Amino acid sequence: WFSFIREAYQGAEDMWRAYSDMKEANWRDSDKYFHARGNYDAAKRGPGGVWAAEVISDAREGIQSLMGRGHEDSMADQEANRWGRSGNDPNHYRPAGLPDKY
C-alpha cells in the first residue's frame, strides 16, 4: 500500500515535470510528445504511477473540454497519454528540432 502511494506521488511529479518542460520549451507541435513522456515516466514507477498519470490526464482533458477546447485535439492528447502509459516510446510524438534537453 505504501509503495502504491509513493509511486503515485512520484508519478505526479513526473507529470508536473513534463508539463513544466512543455511550458519552458514553448515548442510548436510538442504537446503530444510531453503528454506521452509524462505518462511514460509516471507509468515506469509502477501501478501507483499509472494511476496518477491516468487521473491527472483525465482531469486535465476534462477541464480543457469544459473550457471549450476542441474534442479532436483532446482525443489526440488522450491517445498520446495512453501511448506513454502503455510503455511505448514517447519519442514517437517528438517534433523535429525539439532541443535534446527535453
Curated annotation (Swiss-Prot):
Belongs to the SAA family. Major acute phase reactant. Apolipoprotein of the HDL complex. InterPro entries: Serum_amyloid_A (IPR000096), Synovial_Prolif_Regulator (IPR052464). The lineage of its organism: Eukaryota, Metazoa, Chordata, Craniata, Vertebrata. It holds the Pfam family SAA. It is found in: Secreted. GO terms for cellular component: high-density lipoprotein particle. Its main location: secreted. It comes from the Eukaryota. This is Serum amyloid A-5 protein.
